[in-house]
């Protein structure tokens, strides 16, 4: 999209919005004009973004996003501490928590192993994971059913099995190439119930 005819601040806003995932130049333009017509919405959005950047951080235990460290899940007294679920992203924790089926703790990798994108085990939170396994009896791999998700689950299972930890994978009630974030609660709950040892 050609922004040459727009004032520089508007062109910068459109460019910035178009860098967000799933937002192309046309949608970014529509959003920019909406925000110009709704100054209170724009101001509230800007304040919320600044506040989130300032206050949200990774939990020092599970690496999920939180405004309290450690996060409420890690400090929850009713959580099953012998059960740990490994997920790719913080939004996957939200999807699993919506089902109310999983009672254990989580560990967020913040990605998957993807050599083509230059992401190896060192770029993920695997070292923190290995440092928090004391007392854990079962690890549930809840990576998305993609080639990278499967490769990451296999890599982690090879690290964890020699430690005597039972390693399971959620059942594939999820479509290949799909994300936990977009699955409904029933599908995720069935996938958790049907997890299998790997």
UniProtKB/Swiss-Prot annotation:
Q: Name one GO molecular function term.
A: zinc ion binding
Which keywords appear in this protein's UniProt record, sorted alphabetically? DNA damage, DNA recombination, DNA repair, Metal-binding, Zinc, Zinc-finger
Per the record, the zinc finger regions (C4-type) lie at 59-74
- Keyword Membrane annotated: no
UniProt-listed SUPFAM superfamilies: Recombination protein RecR
Task: List, in alphabetical order, the GO biological process terms annotated in this UniProt record.
Answer: DNA recombination; DNA repair
Name all Toprim domain ranges.
82-175
Task: Please give one Pfam family short name.
Answer: RecR_HhH
Tell me the PROSITE patterns matching this sequence. TOPRIM
- Acetylation as a keyword of this entry, yes or no, is no
What NCBIfam families does the record point to? recR (TIGR00615)
Q: Which family does it belong to?
A: Belongs to the RecR family.
Purpose? May play a role in DNA repair. It seems to be involved in an RecBC-independent recombinational process of DNA repair. It may act with RecF and RecO.
Per its UniProt record, what HAMAP family does this chain match?
RecR (MF_00017)
How is this protein named in the record? Recombination protein RecR
**To which species is this protein native?**
Desulfitobacterium hafniense (strain DSM 10664 / DCB-2)
Q: Which gene encodes it?
A: recR
